[in-house]
Amino acid sequence: MRTHYCSAVNELSLDKQITVCGWVHNRRDHGGVIFLDIRDRSGLLQVVYEPENKEIFAIAEKLRSEFVVRVTGIVRKRPEGMINDKMETGRVEVIGTQLEILNQSPTPPFLPDDHQIINEDLRYKYRYIDLRRAVMQKKLTLRHKLNSCIRNYLNEQNFLDIETPMLTKATPEGARDYLVPSRVHPGQFYALPQSPQLFKQLLMMSGFDKYYQIVRCFRDEDLRADRQPEFTQLDIEMAFINEEDILQLIEGLLKIVFKEILNITLPDKLPRMSYKEAMTRYGSDKPDLRNPLELIDIADLVKDCDFNVFASAANDNSGRVVALKLPNGCDLSRKDLDNYGQFVTIYGAKGLAYIKVNDLSAGMAGLQSPILKFLSETAVHSILNRVEAQTGDVIFFGADKAHVVNESMGALRNKLGHDRNLINSGWQLLWVVDWPMFELDPQSNKLQPMHHPFTSPQELSAEALRSKPTQTLAKAYDIVINGYEIGGGSIRIHQPELQKTVFDLIGIDEQEAHEKFGFLLDALQYGAPPHGGIALGIDRLAMLLTDSTSIRDVIAFPKTQTASCPLTSAPSPAGNAQLTELGIRLAPTITTK
């Protein structure tokens, strides 16, 4: 039907007859000559129809935006003054000799033009039009290249691409499951997988020592800019390996991805940072190292001060007091400071103290802050020295339980970095390693795994784990790119007794463990090899590589922030016949919109 994609028509095609197919992107009538911009996924091509061929010209006059056409003509150089170097085909045009309308289109709700600002709901309702835009074509094409690059690399490393079940058993993995009722087994449900975690471990026990899969996963959780109810991840598992093997594999993969897609050369070895250091310096387990701001502990300087907010947190074993210096921040108005104070309350902070350093050489007289009256001159000078304050700086303070300080001041660090244009350009990748095995749930005060309950502790002893669970470190690792967690993984537990110990510590008794994970515990008894793996978020990685602000921009048909699809109106009510067949009756309080 066609001989060329639009962008393939160039000066090498001069004087040749070509045929292209696509959409009418633009139609212009200049002095009795019709100019068409024909668009396909490769780009635009200008076609000219002259009035001498009356029959074809009459067809061209009928064309409107988004008509689907087949065009045949002779390629020629554009006249002087008509060259458009902004277009890949801007030095040539096609003199149309034939024209066929393959399909018509009414005036669309919006034109697939990258320069238009389009309401997001409208974009998703008419996603098939939105995807015609050049920017969306480029983003999804890059995503394809990313997946191809990943497959090529892992295939060369002797990995096997093995599919795992989509209809499986519900297991606790940190989020709510999407449940699928079974018609054959009334009253029972499958769960859509949050990840192939247990199946890939079982594959290691089955002798497939190198597995990967680019797989769909499902989590019924609240949505954010970088979350979707269904998402895609690169899932990897290896047997007879240690942490270093996994880290080197992923470093090699990312090095190739960045080189092939962005022509950026990454270092052979990425920097590593312990979880403890990341939280101490940045208040985050996924720090953006392009941001130069850091949190600085000052608890030892304010333990005996008269400012109770500082003193109580400084003397609390679970508390933390930090300073965050913003260079040249004295131009912040009172309203700006109040807004930042309001911002940190979103993350549990009760407020935001600050000191403006108007003139460092003037001592206390050169400082401005509501809290100065509660602090001794010695304490203030010690704080200024520790943060290396300069005239013109503003110092913000966080004092509370450590988890509140980390979350609120870490978020403030990010916000200040963006608001003040402090974020350096380029790419900053790092591994966050040496994670705690467990954390205490602040509500229930019970242990819960930092990653998942199949992660191996660094000490392979059930006795050591029981004696100091909150001090035990895990063989876990996260890969972070520019402040986004792109992936995470761990070495897994391969000894049944150690796995039972972990279950017991997080409140899963023997009966519950058998009901939910009996198949795994059985498999661990039959010669499970040491193994570990990682999962990388394809959506997030594609978002970063395309410089997008949301993963919805790199997913062909995404859900909205309410987990709905404006295009198909999903989710939708099930009919009574379907519900009856599945043995389901809706509770009276459930209504459908």
Swiss-Prot record:
The keyword Aminoacyl-tRNA synthetase applies. GO terms for molecular function: aspartate-tRNA ligase activity; aspartate-tRNA(Asn) ligase activity; ATP binding; nucleic acid binding. PROSITE patterns: AA_TRNA_LIGASE_II. The record marks H30, G81 as: Important for tRNA non-discrimination. GO terms for cellular component: cytoplasm. L-aspartate binds at E173, R219, H451, R492. Its main location: cytoplasm. GO terms for biological process: aspartyl-tRNA aminoacylation. InterPro entries: Aa-tRNA-synt_II, aa-tRNA-synth_II, aa-tRNA-synth_II/BPL/LPL, Asp-tRNA-ligase_1, Asp-tRNA-ligase_1_N, Asp/Asn-tRNA-synth_IIb, AspRS_core, GAD-like_sf. It is an enzyme of class 6 (ligase). Residues 197-200 are annotated as: Aspartate. It comes from the Bacteria. Its EC number is 6.1.1.23. ATP binds at R219, D220, E221, Q228, E485, G537, I538, D539, R540. The keyword Cytoplasm applies. It catalyses: tRNA(Asx) + L-aspartate + ATP = L-aspartyl-tRNA(Asx) + AMP + diphosphate. It is found in: Cytoplasm. Keywords: Aminoacyl-tRNA synthetase, ATP-binding, Cytoplasm, Ligase, Nucleotide-binding, Protein biosynthesis. Gene3D superfamilies: Bira Bifunctional Protein, Domain 2 (3.30.930.10), GAD-like domain (3.30.1360.30), Nucleic acid-binding proteins (2.40.50.140). Homodimer. Aspartyl-tRNA synthetase with relaxed tRNA specificity since it is able to aspartylate not only its cognate tRNA(Asp) but also tRNA(Asn). Reaction proceeds in two steps: L-aspartate is first activated by ATP to form Asp-AMP and then transferred to the acceptor end of tRNA(Asp/Asn). Belongs to the class-II aminoacyl-tRNA synthetase family. Type 1 subfamily. This is Aspartate--tRNA(Asp/Asn) ligase.
